[in-house]
Amino acid sequence: HTTDGVETHRDCAPKWSSRMLEGDNLLGSPSCTAYLNGTYLGMDDQIKLLIDTELYHRMRMKHGMPFILDDVLIANREHNNRVSAGGVDYDATISDSSRTWLVNKAEIEHIYKKHSDYFVTRKYPDET
C-alpha cells in the first residue's frame, strides 16, 4: 500500500484466505489480478465492499485455485476516494481464530444467500 506513490507500508505477498468470500481479502484489489482471455466472470453490481472477494470466489468455483505469485509486485494507492474508504457502512464484524475484519451486514447477507450452497461445506471443487 502507498499513499504517495513512493513509500510503501503493510507490504504483504498475496495469498488465498479460507474466509475470502466473507471479505478476508489477502489477495488484494482487482488491479492486482490478471485473467486468461475468456475466463473473466464480471462483478456483482449489488455489492461494493465485497465485490472483489465475491469475484475471486466465483472464479475459483469455475476455474479452480488461481496461480498466486508469492511476491510483493504491486502497491495499491490509498486515498480518501477509495470505495472502501467511504460510502460503505461498516456495521458488522467477522472473526476467525486469527483475524477480525469489518463488513457491511447487508452485503454479507447477500453473499450468504447467493452462495448458500458453498457455505454448507465451505469447500471448492478443487479441494478433496
PLM region descriptions:
Residues 65, 88-128:
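C-terminal, non-catalytic tails of nucleotide-sugar-dependent glycosyltransferases
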Residues 2-4, 8-97:
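Conserved nucleotide-sugar donor-binding catalytic segment
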